[in-house]
A protein has these predicted regions:
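Short alpha-helical segment immediately N-terminal to, or the first helix within
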Residues: 33, 308, 373, 571-572
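Residue-level signal for threonine
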Residues: 24, 125, 182, 496-505
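Residue-level detector of conserved catalytic or cofactor/ligand-binding positions
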Residues: 589-606
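C-terminal or mid-to-C-terminal helical accessory/interaction module adjacent to the motor/catalytic core
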Residues: 344-397, 406-409
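Accessory DNA-binding and partner-docking regions appended to nucleic-acid-acting proteins
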Residues: 2-13, 363-364, 393-590, 594
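Helicase motor core with emphasis on the C-terminal RecA-like subdomain
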Residues: 2-4, 8-12, 16-17, 25, ...
């Protein structure tokens, strides 16, 4: 909580412009640093209020705040959201016509802008740099600062040029912000952006309102439909798929089943992507099915779930993508369907990726950490936070491993059977095969392929009849995750690793996990929705307020959350204010609009129906 007094200009802006009564977490300290001319490197989880950390100093300090952002497609929405609050904001990027660009430039030079958003590539232009020389600059904000990391999952080469900001304007404070960075990535950001002297602010990475669940993949589109129908009916969410074809197929399946779903991937025309993104942001209950091309910078507070139908490449990517759920602090779900084919596919992608051996090793380390998170029998939240160097006592009570702890078992003998089969195929026959053939050999199946290669003559043929096919596939998946097997080639053939010999020589025990018999539901079976935890009598009013908000948003041509967020509507439904004065006591309602009287009428009607 902030220590600011009522006369603090920053606190005054927070209340008067943004409608909040107090700062959260590190916000006050960050803002104080920048307002007083200091540099800052800010790590704050999605939904933690990063934007206020540069927007408020830009409004308090003289001059215009310049925000460097890679999110060209979202700049219009960001500017519109600020304009709705009375903030003078504009953007410069390649989408503007010459006439519109000149209008923005005139406004900037005339001192008529509080915030100017620019793309990083724009700062490589001498014309843009000369333009900024002609106006007082309040600060430089470098958003999505992890894009400067050459080892990161969102590397943008143009970010490497941003050290020019300090060289050209040494007295202007800079603030670099990201939601995702390990200690090594933080150090790289500071080095490459010339921020070694900046004060670091590292908030907790914990998102306690998100329930983390990773399930064995089995007909994933049906699993997804079950999740949406039972826990998130009519709610906004994001579904991530690895390929464009999977995006199109999944979106079509959802639409066929009565769900408002839209596709988003780089293969779609820019106009279609823009239209689908606009619908997702502005309408309630839309599900976006997308590749990872979608999501960075999406400022939609009421995303109730993020689902992955394919394995993310890294923990950083997983954390950033799941962090797009529940920005409003209300209960939300991060759900991942994960199977053997995911591991094989990701290993193949690494093997065939561009770059040198060091780059591939780094990709492998990222994947290993993601696989460890998937296969853990401990609290997933604790392991996720540990990856970012933060401690958690565990037993969070809101991840699948805490709600239904999986059993661990000694899988050493099973591992030896798999590894021995791979070894004998290679050593005795000079052959390499994928998972399916290895499992058929272990189960002693009389298939055409087994007979053709005379695999029934191997000593390991049929030694695995103590486990089912699915159980053997789970064993192979966990061996791949633990680095005791790897895959090679376009066909994903299984190959031993240096560590395999320790298991075959009985010098290493292999622990494995049994999956729970029944799927885990969010919050011990309760619906993880915006209406969760509301008293039953308050739910009708909450839904009435959401309907009123949808109408207002459509009339004003703005996203619904710009009118009021779900958290604010929950507060109103609970408090049932009967006057503007009482409405002002609800968090998020300090800034009144012309809609306030209409909203009170909605409350009165809802109260009569109680």
């Amino acid at each position: 909580m902030a220590t600011a007094t009522a006369t603090d200009p920053a606190l005054d802006v927070l209340r008067r412009v943004f409608g909040y009564d107090a700062f959260r977490g590190e916000q006050a300290a960050v803002i104080d640093t920048v307002v007083n001319g200091g540099d800052a490197l800010v790590l704050m989880p999605t939904g933690g209020g990063k934007s206020l950390c540069y927007q408020i100093p830009a409004l308090v300090r003289p001059g215009t705040g310049v925000v460097v952002s890679p999110l060209i497609a979202l700049m219009q929405d960001q500017v519109d959201a600020l304009a709705a609050l009375g903030v003078r904001a504009a953007f410069l990027n390649s989408t503007l016509s010459s006439e519109d660009r000149r209008a923005v430039e005139r406004a900037l030079v005339a001192g008529e802008l509080d915030l100017l958003y620019v793309a990083p590539e724009g700062l490589r232009s001498r014309a843009t740099l000369d333009l900024l020389d002609r106006t007082p600059i309040a600060l430089f904000a470098i958003d999505e600062a992890h894009c400067v990391s050459q080892w990161g999952h969102d590397f943008r080469p143009d970010y490497l040029e941003l050290s020019v900001l300090h060289q050209r304007w040494p007295s202007v404070p800079r603030i670099a912000l990201t939601a995702t960075a390990t200690a090594a990535t933080r150090a790289e950001i500071a080095l490459r952006l010339d921020l070694e002297g900046a004060r670091h602010f590292v908030s907790s990475f914990d998102r306690p309102n998100i329930t983390y669940r990773i399930v064995p993949k089995d007909r994933p589109e049906k699993q997804l439909l079950d999740l949406l129908r039972t826990e998130h009916a009519g709610e906004a969410g994001i579904v991530y798929c690895l390929s464009r074809a999977s995006v199109e197929r999944t979106a079509a399946t959802l639409v066929e089943n009565g769900i408002q779903a839209l596709p988003y991937h780089a293969g779609l025309p820019a106009s279609v992507r823009a239209a689908n993104q606009s619908r997702f942001l502005r309408e309630d209950g839309v599900v976006m099915v997308a590749t990872i091309a979608f999501g960075m910078g999406i400022d939609k507070p009421d995303v109730r779930f993020v689902a992955h139908l394919d394995l993310p490449k890294s923990v950083e990517g997983y954390y950033q993508e799941t962090g797009r759920a529940g920005r409003d602090g209300l209960p939300s779900t991060a759900w991942l369907a994960y199977g053997l084919a995911d591991v094989v596919q990701q290993r193949k992608l690494i093997e065939t990726s561009d770059g040198d051996a060091a780059h591939r090793r780094n990709l492998g380390r990222h994947l290993d950490a993601m696989l460890a998170l998937c296969e853990t029998v401990e609290c997933r939240r604790a392991q996720l936070l540990a990856y970012f160097g933060q401690e958690h006592p565990g037993a969070c009570g809101s991840c699948d491993t805490c709600l239904a702890p999986p059993e661990a078992w000694d899988g050493t003998v099973a591992a030896q059977k798999v590894l021995s089969t791979v070894f004998r195929l290679d050593r005795e026959r000079g052959q390499r095969f994928g998972v399916g053939q290895v499992v058929d050999i272990l189960l002693g199946r009389d298939t055409e392929k087994v007979r053709r290669f005379r695999h029934q003559e191997l000593s390991v043929f049929g030694v695995g009849d103590d486990l089912s096919e699915n159980e053997w596939r789970a064993v192979v998946r966990q061996l791949l995750a633990q680095g005791l097997l790897t895959v090679e080639g376009a066909h994903g053939t299984l190959v031993l690793t240096a560590a395999s010999g320790e298991v075959l020589a009985r010098r290493r025990e292999v622990r494995m996990r049994h999956e729970p018999a029944r799927p885990v539901r969010a919050a011990k079976g309760r619906k993880a929705s915006a209406a969760a935890e509301l008293a039953e009598a308050d739910v009708p009013l909450f839904e009435a307020l959401r309907a009123w908000r949808a109408g207002e948003a459509k009339t004003q041509g703005v996203p619904a959350y710009i009118v009021f967020g779900d958290a604010t509507l929950r507060g109103i439904a609970t408090a049932r204010p009967g006057s503007l004065e009482r409405l002002a006591l609800v968090s998020g309602c300090l800034v009144f609009t012309s809609d306030a009287a209409d909203e009170l009428q909605c409350v009165e009607r809802g109260g009569r129906r109680r």
